[in-house]
Structures are given as C-alpha cells and as structure tokens.
Amino acid sequence: MASVRSHEDIELMTYSEVVEVSGYVGNFKAKIRKKARYIDESKCTGCDECSKVCPVELDSEFNEGLSKRKAIYIPFPQAVPNKATVDKRGYPPCRVTCPAGVNAQGYIALISEGKFQEALEVVRRTMPFAGVCGRVCTHRCESECERGQVDEPMSIRTLKRFIADYELKAGREKAIPIEQTKDSKVAIVGSGPAGLACAYDLVSRGYPVTVFEALPMAGGLLRYGIPEYRLPNEVLDAEIDYVRELGVEIKTDTPVTALKELSNQGYQAIFLGTGAWVSQKMGIPGEDSEGVIHALDFLKKVNSGAEVNLGNRVVVTGGGNAAVDSARVALRLGAKEVTIIYRRSRVEMPAAASEVDEAEHEGVNIHILANPVKVLSHDGRLTGIECIRMELGEPDASGRRRPVPIEGSEFTMEIDNLILAIGQAVDRESLPKELAYTQWGTLSVDPVTGETNIPGVFAGGDVVEGPADVITAVAAGKEAAESIDRYLSGIDLREGRPKQLDRVKEVSKEGVVKKTRAAMPMLDLDKRLGSFAEVELGLDEDTAIEEAKRCLNCAACSECLECLKVCEANAIDHEMEEEIIEVDVGSIIVATGFQQFDPSVIYQYGYGRYDNVVTGLQFERLSSASGPTEGEIFLADGRKPESIAILHCVGSRDENYHKYCSRVCCMYALKFSHLLGEKLPDASIYQLYIDMRCAGSGYEEFYERLQEEGVNFIRGRAGEITNIAESPEEEGKLVVIVEDTLVRRKRRIPVDMAILSCALEPCADADQVARIFSLSRKADGFFLEKHPKLDPVATMSDGVFVVGCCQSPKDIPDTVAQASAAAARALAMISKGTVEIEAATAVIDEEYCAGCKICIGLCPYKAISFDEEKEVSTINEAICKGCGVCVATCPSGAITGKHFTTEQIMAEIEGVLV
C-alpha cells in the first residue's frame, strides 16, 4: 500500500465510489462520489489526537467487532492514506424529533465521559434552557429513542437537567459578552421561551437585542405559569441571567402596545413572543360566581407571591399540565380534598403521564368521563357544581374519540373552589391593532418565515401556535431569529427552508445488553405538602454517567465538536459535503471483492448467541500481533481456551445457502490450527471438514504436517453447537455435535471455542455494481467473465475487466495472477491505441426508424442513443455486441444485424429446406 501511495502515476481516491459510467472502450466517463470525510486531507497529519478526545465508541470493522474505535478514527496504523475519517451516518432520531434540534446524542456522549461542562456547552449551542427543558420539556425525543426497542428509552430530559444542575452546584462563572458586530437593532416583545430563544440566537449572531416584558420579572409562562416544585426560580433565574450576560438587554414592567414606538426607537426588526395568557371559559351557567378561578390567573398569583385563599374542597376541570399543576398547587396551599374532572379517559389526558401519577400519589382524585354543566351558587358565591357523565363516541377532528353526554347521568358535588383549566387563548387587547389574526384568534404569520402581515415584524410561540409546550416555543424563536437575520442581511427569507435533517436509516442493536433506565429520585411525600420544594431531585454523577452509557450512538459522530479543540492543524470540517468528480478513462478494472457469509442465519451454530463462537476473520484478528489482544488467544471471560473446534464449509457446499466451494476455507482453517498449536501447545484442536481441498503449491504438505502435529481431523459437517451439557466434562463448555462419517457415529465434542470457516459470497451491492458497469452475473451471484478459459478477466463490455473474488472465490496467489493479467490487458490497449470490435453489430435503417426509443431501454450494453435532430435511434458500433435484442424487438423492422440481413437469413433457410 505504501508503494501505491507513493507512486507518481497512481491517484488514490479513497472513501469514494463510482456511481455512473458512460461511454465505451477507450472513452469512458466515470462519475465518482467522493464521500465527505470531514477531514481536510491536505492538513491532517495523522496524529490521532482527535480520536483520544472523541466520546463515541463504535465496533471496529478492522478488528471484526472484537474491539472498539472512535467516531473519528484512523482504521489501523498502516492505513493509506494515514488520515482520520469522521463516521457520520445521518442525524439521530432524538435530534430529528426535537423541534429545536437540540443535539441530545452530543451531550449524552460527553456525560458518559464525565465531561459535564462540555456537555452543557453542546446544549447551549442550540438554546440556553438546559435546566428549564431538563425539567418541563415534554421530551418527544424519548418516544423516538432507538434504545426503547431494546429495553427503555434513554432518560434524555433528565440528563439535560443533570448538566445544568451540575454547573449551578459547582458555581457558574459569568458568561463572556458576545461582541456586537451588527448595527441593526432588534426588539423582542415578551420574555417567555420563544422571546428569550430568539434573543439568544440573535445576540449570538452579533445583533444588539432588547427584550420588552410587561410583567415585573422575565420568564413569561415559565415563571408565572409553572409551579416552583417543578421549575425552581433559581434555575430559571440562572438561565435568564446567562442570556443577559451575553449581551441581551431585558426591560421589565415595559408593555408594548404600538409597533411604531419601537420603530421610532430605531429597532429595525421586531419579534412578538407574548404567549397565550387568557384562560378560556367553559360557557356554563354560574361560571362568573365568586370562588371560580382560572388556572393561569391562579398559578400567576401563586408564583408572584400573592396571597391565595382556597377552601377545603377544590375541583379542577381539564386534563392538561395546567390542570394537574393547579391541583397539586391547591394541595400545597392547604386544600383538604382536590379533584380533577376530565371529560375523556385517563390515557387521553394531555398532561405528562408522570405528572398525573405524582398528582395521584400526592392525593389528587381524578374523575374521568365527566364534565361540569353548571356552577351552583348562593348569593353569588360558589357552593357546588353539577356534572354529567360522558361516554366516548366516534373520533373527532383530533383523532380522539368524542366524549358524548349520557342522558340522565347528572350528579352534583359540593365544593369551595372551581379552577378552570380547559385551554388558553391569545390576549388580543395587549397586541398592536394593525396585526392580522387567524380564525382561531392567533397571530397570522408565514408558516415558513414567521413573518406577520407587517414586513420586518415576526412572531412565534403560543401567540401563533396557541398553547403548546416549551420546546415548541423555543424552536419558533430560533426560526424567527433565522428569518430576522436574513431580513436584516437582505437574504431571501424562504430559500432552503424548512431544513430537513436526514435521519439515520438503520441502527444496529446487535449485542446490546439490556440495562435498567435510571430512576429519578423523588422528594418524600411528607415533605411535599405545605411546601413548594422541588419534587424531582435529579441524578447523581455516577447514575448520570451510567445512564449516558446506555446510548446507542445512533448517528456515530455525535457532533460534540471536542475534536476541534485538539486539532492543531485545523483539519476538521464538520460542514464538509460530498463531491461528484468526473474522470475520463480508457479501461476499467472491477475488483470489488467479497463479503463474508453471515453465520448467524445458521441458528444451530450459535453465532451471536454464544460469546466464544467466532468467525475465521475474527480469529484472524485475535491471533494477529496488531489485533485487539496483541496476538494472545483469550475467551470472552479472559481465560485461555484448552480446546478449540474449527468448522469448515459454513455457508458453502450447502444446498441451503451456497452450493459452491469457497476455495480458501480449508487452507486458512489449517493455518489456524498451526497458529493455535504455537500459541496454545497444550490445547486440543479439532478440524471438522467435509472434504479437505488443498489444491495449491505446498498445501498438501502443510496438511500432512498438521496431522503429524496432532490436530484431530473429523470428517463430517457439524450439526449443532450447544451449551447444554449431558455429562460432567461438558459442563461450562460449548458442545459441537457432529456425525463422524469415517466411523459412522455421532460425536459430542466439548470445546471452549468454536471457529467458523465462513463462505465467501458476493457483496451486497453486487447488483448495483453490475448495472453501473454493464456486467452480467452468474447463478451464484459473482460477476461473469467473457470466457472461463480463453478470456477469464475480460467481460462482455469491452474495456471492463473483473479480477479477484468479485469474479469467483479464490486465494491470494490466484487473485494476484488475475490482477496482473487484467493490468496487462489494459496496458496492451493503451500501447496499441486501437481495439477490435465485433463484426456482427446491429444496424439501423433510418428510413424505417419510427423513433419509438424502445430499443434504447432494452439494450444491455447502452449502445443505442437517440439523435434528436434526425429523430431516429443510432447505434455506437464500438459498444454494440451484436446480441440481437434490438433486432428482435424493433416494431418497425428498422434494425438488422450486420452480415445477417433478412435476405441472407431467408436465403439460408430456403437453401436448407429446398
């Protein structure tokens, strides 16, 4: 490889694949996809410092999965070129599902390494709310987590909270202000999650940003709508302070009612993130009675520190988080009996299931399939409610079954307070009058850009979407920041949006051991009531690290960007894209090799189920001095094996899989026996073979030598490998069951390790390769040569040669000989300068050609094209092989074979018959 690399006439295009070939012998055009390595090869020094800090470990392909490598890696020390590669397989499901695109795999990977502050930096590249979202996010990411298909989803939200809490406990350092590089001022109206997220993104881009908040403190519904036992003020304050420290100015007690005010102050773009603060009414009699409270008003008063007096009996109507929060707050304020009434079933409650469970645990009663129809009062004061029972009917527009009242099922409840939590709406009175609204009362904006009917004015969050979760509001703020940046920079607001993340297509779960998801420690029940102390206590360091290690690293590279910090050559480029390169070549040599037969499909051999059943390639790496064990042979538990069985013809010479002989298995199985004899001289070695095929120079002599060395040869195909013992000597062993055809009896051979000599089979993409290079395939799937004896390296496509195991299984000497032959053929064509073509090519009579183009699609050699000017098909004689497909299918009879005209053929037939 080193000689190839240093040869001045050889250009190595690694990490590349041919995607299209056109033209003909001597004049091929090849399109090559050069995959993104994410490394500038001209800068990379191969120092491998990047892999040392990479937190992601993956199975090493070079060591056949027996060891690990990093997501940024050099495959092996002698790799050519000796440059790193970043393994990116798409975006992980958690990141794709997150509305804000938070890189969960990135911070989880760093947590697994104990790099907690670095993990927090990963979250802050996207948003400033690790502590907030670590507590109140609806964690849609967890519902898509691939780990859930193994045991339970990753505790993504909890891990995010952990790194935020870790910084708070360690003492957060003040953030360094971001330099303002832009002159255009931006105003943000509303300091909720949407407004702060928008401000955060814009200040990160260098804009001077001011946030206007009507209430005394920043935070919006995060502060005034979520109780402290779920979101402590110190956590929210810390993250708002972080945004301030970066350079965002926040003005509280400053309502904005006219956009012109902001324009007059020099603001060139405005974002409205004022939320949905108005509680919806039920529209039932007596709803305005004293003692009826709206949930948002109730929570706002409590969170503001105002005195709130409740009676002993409180009913909350609704099934969302606001309803559950109100019920749990009522208990903490001293209510003796708190009941949630919800008109649908328990499973259809939109509140987080964990919050509902905790509410019940604290003593909240949940009355499902019921709905208040009337508020009972005396002298204007609430005394009770009248409800009706419901049943579920046909699905409504939301897809849920519609609740239908049951006639005659009315009942009453005596209560002291009723808290309404059935929905929220936008407060239009607090917004500028010139804005346009939708039929649902929310602000009307462009669905892609977030721009309102007024140019330069954008909106997002609940004021646009209606009541939604925090992370949706954060995402809206981020999208608005992108739009504002484009607007102020004079760039098209819509181009390239919305951006679609390419989700990783397949995540291997092979060999993943089930582990219990980390449980969240909870505050004792007796410490909750009468107190607003946080209920969820958070994970400790050890638990967080162990939980993070459960991650499957779906996308390989987590894009944590730790590698950038240590690369002194600045060779890493995570934004690199693949290239399509076109090259002109005269000939093509196809040497795509083979793939190893997957022995796990032969279930009875136990590969993938028993740790000490390995393939031949895996043992090759185990026995190599550069392998994962430095050449020492160990079992999975660290012991050295005392007995080893080597099974021949696994997947080959088998009617159920491949009928052909793989040719190399016998010899490498014998080589393994010799290596084992050297490394483990006292071990018992068994060779289980059908026929020993040692056809090569010195091969038979080597076979005889191993017989003399004491290797046990048993003629017969193994029927099963099991760990079920039938005698004391089989305890703790693998038992190979085989019929010894020489002595005609079944044998049970207890061994410590079994090595499977697997078949060589065509690569999985062989069909695609065949289409690209116009190759034919044999019945066994390997590429078909032009003639097995007279032309074993050429194909039916002139100038295209096949060599090595892609043509048929063969050993290294035969592969080298075939490769040399193909090289000689290619060089001969170059030196000669001309090629001989088939004499019997097809010819098109342009007068008869109808231009139907049927022949073009049928030609297996792509020899026919269409002349747009003449409107007829034409044949390239240099490519045509005279196969006759086009002649037989031409509906107008315009195509004939040269030297095989219709007149000639008819005359020949007539001569035979007459």
Q: Where is each model-derived feature located?
A:
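Non-heme iron-sulfur electron-transfer modules
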Residues: 1, 13-43, 55-93, 102-128, ...
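Beta1-alpha1 glycine-rich phosphate/pyrophosphate-binding loop at the start
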Residues: 1-6, 70-71, 93, 99-112, ...
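A Rossmann-like FAD-binding core segment of flavoenzymes
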Residues: 4-36, 40, 232-280, 293-310, ...
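Phosphate-coordination loops involved in phosphoryl transfer and adenosine-cofactor binding
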Residues: 15, 41, 182-185, 253, ...
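Residue-level detector of alpha-helix initiation sites
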Residues: 49, 128, 192-193, 320-322, ...
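FAD-site-proximal beta/loop scaffold in flavoenzymes
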Residues: 60-82, 290-312, 395-467, 509, ...
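Long hydrophobic segments that form regular secondary structure
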Residues: 311-344, 406-417, 423-425, 440-441, ...
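A conserved FAD-binding loop/helix module that cradles the flavin
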Residues: 326, 463-488, 589, 656-667, ...
